[in-house]
Amino acid sequence: MARPVSERTPAPLLLGGPTGAPPGGGALLGLRSLLQGTSKPKEPTSCLLKEKERKASPPAATVPGPGLETAGPADASAGAVVGGGSPRGRPGAAPGPGLLAPLLWERTLPFGDVEYVDLDAFLLEHGLPPSPPPPGGPSPAPSPVRTPAPSPRPGSCGSASPRSSPGHAPARAALGAAGGHRAGLTSRDTPSPVDPDTVEVLMTFEPDPADLALSSIPGHETFDPRRHRFSEEELKPQPIMKKARKIQVPEEQKDEKYWSRRYKNNEAAKRSRDARRLKENQISVRAAFLEKENALLRQEVVAVRQELSHYRAVLSRYQAQHGAL
């Protein structure tokens, strides 16, 4: 059954604004109302009460928004038709204050936001080893890797953050906990071995300056008994060399060739004796230092053994009371 003509809402009122508004503004208001969502249906009684209050209140000039005219007494009837409901409770699409908000196509999306992520810090956060340095040459300083963060699509209606979604937070927390547990296990492992050559014993050793002078090569660095290391060949016992049998040369055969050869032999013998004496002096000074260091280390070993026996006794009493570990 068709409704009476008085109950039908004219098409311009559904899409248009108040009376006297330009035709373009009415279409824009209708499009805005459709995009912003239809309002909930109002009860006829509430609409009538609002209409009575509007008639009773004095006309006030309001600042119109884009496409809206100033509400006055001349358009009260049009507002009643638009805002008021039909007998069946079907209200018209009345423009509300929410229409003054910026529209979707007027919003600016942050397409230029770029985040900088440190790759090594990201890997360490998740318990992964950092990127290995390139082979050969010193490793360069870690530079931040420019990684563009994912930005939302132009057509998306929500203001999604460019970072990862909250659903990834439990996975990141689990990875962080695993990395921390792995770091704790690594710290409780046996420490790496120490090079014994780099260990220095705290002791006072002041060798005689004359012995150091005899143990040093003239024009070279002073001999240091604390750091000097002898090779295995140098520490091998040297065999006793027998002297060569002397050969008597008559005076008439001692010419220039004989004297030059004898001079060279004497110089070689002198260099050999000096080198042997230098090595003997170095070994003696080094041996004096090692003897004193050995005595000090023996005292430390005795103290460590006493402490070890004490801890073993404590451990045995604990195992006897609470069982084996």
UniProtKB/Swiss-Prot annotation:
Question: What gene does this protein come from?
Answer: DBP
What residue spans carry the Basic and acidic residues bias annotation?
221-236
InterPro entries named in the record: bZIP, bZIP_sf, PAR_bZIP
Specify where it is mainly localized.
nucleus
Stretches with biased composition (Gly residues):
17-28
GO MF terms here are: DNA-binding transcription factor activity, RNA polymerase II-specific; RNA polymerase II cis-regulatory region sequence-specific DNA binding
User: Which family does the entry's similarity section mention?
Assistant: Belongs to the bZIP family. PAR subfamily.
Keywords for this protein: Activator, Biological rhythms, DNA-binding, Nucleus, Phosphoprotein, Transcription, Transcription regulation
User: Which segments show compositional bias classed as Low complexity?
Assistant: 29-38, 71-80, 88-100, 166-176
Span list, region Disordered: 1-100, 124-198, 212-255
Task: Supply the SMART domains for this chain.
Answer: BRLZ (SM00338)
Name the UniProt record assigns to this protein: D site-binding protein
Location of region: Basic motif: 257-279
Sequence ranges of Pro residues compositional bias: 129-153
Kindly list the places in or outside the cell where this protein is found, as annotated in its UniProt entry: Nucleus
Q: Where is the bZIP domain?
A: 255-318
Q: What task does this protein carry out? A: This transcriptional activator recognizes and binds to the sequence 5'-RTTAYGTAAY-3' found in the promoter of genes such as albumin, CYP2A4 and CYP2A5. It is not essential for circadian rhythm generation, but modulates important clock output genes. May be a direct target for regulation by the circadian pacemaker component clock. May affect circadian period and sleep regulation.
Q: Where is this region: Leucine-zipper?
A: 283-297
List residues, modification Phosphoserine: 86
